[in-house]
Amino acid sequence: MEEIRISDYTATKVSDTRFGLDAGTMFHMIPRALWEKKVRPDEQHRIFIGLNCLLLRGRGRTILYDAGVGSKLNEKRRKIFGLDPTATLIHDLEKAGVRRSEIDTVVLSHLHF
């Protein structure tokens, strides 16, 4: 797991899943010949972006910054965004050695879904 130290806190990147967005929408006016050197779209013209959250631990606190997509989207929406049902934030938190019950603060920076 990727971790960095920030003052008295350890910051760990934890992933929920990845999601697909229309490549043309994402890159807008950038020519495909340029962006396709770095990323290849799938057959539905989507590029996939990691949906990552930040786990902060320190000073006796465990803070989760953003909470991923969750499990409430219906199958149609999950398919549209190409969400992997086997990748979950809970799984990555467990890999980081954290149980849900240990998180005392959740910060939601913005809402997408």
Give the residues covered by each predicted segment.
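Alpha-helix capping at helix-to-loop junctions
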Residues: 95-99, 112-113
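Metallo-beta-lactamase
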Residues: 1-95, 102-113
